[in-house]
Amino acid sequence: MNLREFARDQSCVACGARDGTVVLAHYFGPRRHSYGGGIGHKGHDAVGAHLCARCHADMDTNMRNKAKRWEASEIFLHYCALTWIRVCDALAQRRAA
């Protein structure tokens, strides 16, 4: 399964929007180096969340705010977990079909 393509038909895990702007947003918080990310390149697709354009922009803003960085990181990683639950459920449905 291509995780980036799969995101296109999904709703946003943060707000529920299904507005055609949902993408696999890559985690880029303070732990990004642990997940293969760094300056100039994205981390592993496994550490991504289905976010709409508005929620993606909100996460970008909060990650850049030093006062909110760790809280935003925890929230983003929660969204990644919700995305993985969705992916696992979809894979299970495909196997059952």
Annotate the PLM regions.
Residues 15-18, 55, 83:
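General secretory precursor processing signal
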Residues 1-28:
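Short cysteine-rich loop/turn motifs with clustered Cys
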Residues 34-49, 57-97:
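Polybasic, low-complexity binding patches
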Residues 22-30, 49-59:
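Histidine-centered catalytic micro-motifs
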